[in-house]
Amino acid sequence: MEWKIYKEEFDKKAEVKLEWLDSEFNKIKSGRPNPKILDHVMVEAYGDKSKLFEIANMQVVEGKQIVVKPYDKTLLHDINSAIQKENLGLSVQVDADSLRIIFPSPTEETRKASVKKVKEFSEQVKVEIRNIRKDVHHKIKDDKELREDELKWYEEDLDKLTREWNAKVDKAFAEKEKELMTI
C-alpha cells in the first residue's frame, strides 16, 4: 500500500482525538466567559431535548458574563434548569427575557486544579496517538508488498507524523494552560 493511505488513516483517527481534546478543554472554566462551555447543555424544549445554542443566542458581556436570550421566552426556566443541572459552578440570574450567567473569578487553587485536569486530558490523547501509531505500524510491517527500504522510510515518516500530532496536542495544552493561568 502507498504511504498516503497509511497517513490518511493516521490523520483521520488522530483528528478525532484532537477534536475530543478540544471539546474537553471547552468544558473547563477559565474565569473568562466562553459560550463553548455551554455547548453540551441539553434543554428540554417542545417535548424533545435540544442543544442550548440551537434555541438561544449567547453573547459575552461586561467581561464576566454571558447573556443567553432564548428565541422563545417561554423556555427561560427550562434553560435555567438545564444549566443548573450541569453543575458548572456558575451563577445564573433570570431576567424578563434573558439569563445572565456570571463567571466567578477562579482562585489560584482552582486554576491549578484546572491545569492539572487539562494536562491529564492532553496525556490521555498522547497515549491514544501512540496507540494509533502502533496500529498503523503493525499494518505497515504486515504489508508484504513493501521492500526493506520502503518499510524503513514508512516507519520514519510514521514517527515524524506522530511527533507532529503530539506537537499539536502540546500546543493546545500550552494555549489552554495560558488561558487558565491568566488572571
UniProtKB/Swiss-Prot annotation:
Q: In terms of domain of life, where is this protein from?
A: Bacteria
InterPro entries linked: Ribosome_recyc_fac, Ribosome_recyc_fac_dom, RRF_sf
Q: Which UniProt keywords apply?
A: Cytoplasm, Protein biosynthesis
Q: Which Gene3D superfamilies match?
A: 3.30.1360.40, Ribosome-recycling factor
Gene Ontology biological process terms in this record: translational termination
In its keyword annotation, does this UniProt entry include S-adenosyl-L-methionine? no
A Pfam family assignment: RRF
Task: Tell me the GO molecular function terms.
Answer: ribosomal large subunit binding
* Disulfide partners: none
Report the subcellular localization.
Cytoplasm
Name the GO cellular-component terms.
Answer: cytoplasm
Its annotated function is as follows:
Responsible for the release of ribosomes from messenger RNA at the termination of protein biosynthesis. May increase the efficiency of translation by recycling ribosomes from one round of translation to another.
- Please give the NCBIfam families that the UniProt record associates with this protein: frr
Similarity-based family: Belongs to the RRF family.
From the Swiss-Prot or TrEMBL record, give the protein name.
Answer: Ribosome-recycling factor
Species of provenance:
Malacoplasma penetrans (strain HF-2) (Mycoplasma penetrans)
